[in-house]
């Protein structure tokens, strides 16, 4: 089990950080994920290279989503500053490090960040996201669009500062 932890804890911690901003909460979700992984490792079926990491990532994502749903302050349609509903061109991320981009994603409101991670990074459809989060597919699409708009503005602001 120690070898499993040493090999994958960093990757799983990164997944937690994409969904949850508070470091202590990230650690809690990582710990819960590892408990679930250790408890259910006997149900894992090897399906080729990368299947173990994918299986553990899915457990970690599910734990992060359960944590977010349990938060009383988590509302997918929470109070957020108004955003112009314009069509945003792809933001120019040239010159930005992966860490800078991830930091900007972490600064999104929780609902936007969750939908953005599931759609843009995990490759889920808006229908799958809606089912997982208990929202409508149109709400997922709207939140994704707003997340992209906010990220584009963050990138523009950041580039003006450098």
Feature roles, as predicted:
Residues 115-116:
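A short pre-motif secondary-structure segment
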């Amino acid at each position: 089990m120690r070898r499993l932890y040493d090999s994958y804890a960093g990757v799983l911690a990164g997944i937690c950080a994409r969904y949850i901003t508070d470091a202590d909460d990230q650690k809690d979700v990582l710990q819960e994920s590892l408990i679930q992984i250790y408890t259910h490792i006997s149900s894992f079926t090897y399906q080729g290279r990368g299947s173990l990491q994918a299986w553990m990532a899915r457990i970690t994502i599910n734990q992060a989503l359960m944590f977010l749903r349990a938060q009383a302050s988590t509302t997918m349609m929470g109070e957020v500053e108004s955003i112009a509903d314009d069509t945003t061109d792809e933001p120019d991320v040239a010159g930005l490090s992966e860490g800078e981009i991830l930091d900007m994603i972490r600064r999104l409101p929780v609902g936007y960040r969750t939908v953005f991670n599931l759609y843009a990074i995990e490759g889920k459809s808006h229908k799958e996201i809606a089912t997982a989060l208990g929202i409508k597919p149109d709400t997922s699409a709207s939140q994704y669009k707003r997340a992209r708009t906010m990220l584009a503005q963050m990138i523009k602001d950041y580039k003006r500062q450098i």
